[in-house]
Amino acid sequence: MFAVIETGGKQYKVKPGQRLRVESLAGEVGDKIAFDKVLLVAAGEEVSVGAPYVAGGSVQATIANHGRHKKVTIIKFRRRKHSMKRQGHRQNYTEIVIDTINGKTE
C-alpha cells in the first residue's frame, strides 16, 4: 500500500514505516500529525485517484526529528568590476515516519 501526499508545496510517495524529510512543520519530536491532502491511494491492484484530493483520505505520521539541510552557497559575480557577493542558505526540514495510510480504494 502506498499514497501520494502534498505538503510544503511538494508531492511525496509514501509507504507505512517510511522515513522522509519534508519542509519544516510545527510540532515537537514525538507528536502525531495527519496529512489530509492525499492525491492518490493504492492498495495492490486497487487505486483511488483524487480530484484533486481523495475523499476521506489521510496519512498519519510521527515527527522524528527537526534539522537543517546542507548549506547552499550563492555567488553573484560582477565581471570587470572586481567585486562579488557571497550568500549562504540552510533550509529547515522536519523528518517524519509514516504510521498509517487511510483511504478507501475503488
From Swiss-Prot:
Subunit structure, as described in the record: Part of the 50S ribosomal subunit. Contacts protein L20.
GO terms for biological process, alphabetical: translation
GO cellular component: cytoplasm; ribonucleoprotein complex; ribosome
Database matches in HAMAP family: Ribosomal_bL21
Keyword Ribonucleoprotein on entry: yes
Protein name per the record: Large ribosomal subunit protein bL21
GO terms, molecular function: rRNA binding; structural constituent of ribosome
Family: Belongs to the bacterial ribosomal protein bL21 family.
Species name: Dichelobacter nodosus (strain VCS1703A)
Organism domain of life: Bacteria
Keywords for the protein's UniProt record, in alphabetical order: Ribonucleoprotein, Ribosomal protein, RNA-binding, rRNA-binding
InterPro entries attached to this UniProt entry: bL21-like, bL21-like_sf, Ribosomal_bL21, Ribosomal_bL21_CS
General function of this protein: This protein binds to 23S rRNA in the presence of protein L20.
Pfam families documented for this protein: Ribosomal_L21p (PF00829)
